[in-house]
């Protein structure tokens, strides 16, 4: 795989809880209208978060839980654990299944990490969410429907790339995830027009590729 090839993620496990146990629902702090849960794991956390946001736009569901697992998919407790667990909550199993279907479609065909080099040892994500759903807009603290540049890379690459992205276009920093995260990456959510978010993604990509080509730049 040469640099910039997509790294397609996979769903590792999925189940529907048609009617959540009342005690469990209280423990999860579910609102009364959430009666069913969709559980899904995949081997790419950030792609799965974007897919979960897509589900909120296509079905009557909410993301009631979403967390990355420590140290990434390669170090999970089982092959089915993947890198992240998402719980979609909905009023009934049909809506939850519709949300899971939307997630699967996006995980298999939507946003994806890319290799920054031919050695395939450095991956990054620079993706424009053209219209945020309830999950990402709430996470980033932006207005529902606003575009977002979703940027992820290893710590130094992300730090350098986020600065380059912010300087490249009329975008604002909505959320910054400093290193180390659960998977030892760093990330940022930038907001602005779709065109500005695309320009920011391009600048971020260029910065990450520059470091991949020449990691140590002497003053």
Swiss-Prot record:
CDD domains: BMC_EutL_repeat1, BMC_EutL_repeat2. Residues 1-113, 114-215 form the BMC circularly permuted domain. Residues 45-46 are annotated as: Part of the acidic patch lining the small pore. Zn(2+) binds at residue 157. Transmembrane segments: none annotated. The record marks 53, 83 as: Part of the acidic patch lining the small pore. It holds the Pfam family BMC. Belongs to the EutL/PduB family. Has 2 BMC domains which can evolve independently of each other. This is Bacterial microcompartment shell protein EutL. It comes from Escherichia coli (strain K12). The gene is eutL.
